[in-house]
Regions:
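Amphipathic, non-transmembrane alpha-helical secondary structure
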Residues: 10-13, 51, 168, 172
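Phosphate-binding site of ATP-dependent enzymes
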Residues: 9-10, 19-24, 28-119, 123, ...
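ATP-dependent carboxylate activation and anion-phosphoryl transfer catalytic cores
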Residues: 94-98, 111-177
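Well-ordered beta-strand positions
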Residues: 4, 79-80, 138
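Conserved N-proximal alpha/beta basic substrate-recognition cap immediately N-terminal to
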Residues: 1-5, 10-13
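A structural micro-motif
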Residues: 1, 21-22, 60-62, 132, ...
Length: 177
């Protein structure tokens, strides 16, 4: 979905007003679902959240992404190592809109569809080309929601859901390149 970085809350506000619909606000760096909000033009706190997330125009970036309705059915966290997908699981929001495990999301083992597998092949090539040897990608096919290259997470969750320990495989793939 469209992802718009900006330091100006006014620019983001105009986009929300003109395009309508739901949008996700989040910081460019962060984890665990902290400071991730859904905003809509008619909500009374949308402008205040935009102002806060951009530090009132004082040079702090905010990311705004079109909300993907299908995420209500869950998103898949896919782990990549050495340019290939190595494991995945599904996360579904339970308490609020955030699919982060620490925020109460429910997890389950899952497979990738043929179309998701093809998309992951292309994502793996992209990640390898960018030098990202280990990453987690959140996706709701056909959308890539987020790339997680600093702290991909998910190894423990996959082990708990499937009994498969991917650590050695990931190390081998990362070191092979």
């Amino acid at each position: 979905p469209p992802l718009l970085p900006a330091m100006s809350w006014l620019i983001l506000w105009e986009i929300i007003r003109n395009r309508g619909g739901k949008w996700i606000l989040k910081p460019p760096a962060g984890s665990f679902g902290r400071d991730v909000f859904i905003v809509e033009p008619q909500q009374s706190n949308t402008r205040a959240l935009l102002q806060n997330m951009t530090a009132h125009g004082s040079g702090q970036y905010c990311l705004m992404q079109r909300y993907v309705e299908e995420i209500a059915e869950g998103e898949k966290r896919v782990l990549f190592a050495g340019g290939r997908s190595v494991g995945q699981y599904k996360r579904k929001a339970v308490i609020d809109h955030r699919t982060n495990v620490i925020q109460g999301a429910r997890t389950e083992a899952c497979d990738l569809t043929d179309k998701e597998t093809d998309l992951c092949r292309r994502i793996g090539q992209y990640l390898a080309g960018m030098g990202a040897e280990f990453a987690g990608v959140d996706m709701v096919y056909p959308y890539v929601i987020e790339f997680n290259v600093i702290n991909p997470g998910g190894l423990k969750t996959i082990f708990e859901l499937t009994g498969v320990n991917l650590a050695a495989q990931i190390i081998d793939r990362v070191l092979a390149d």
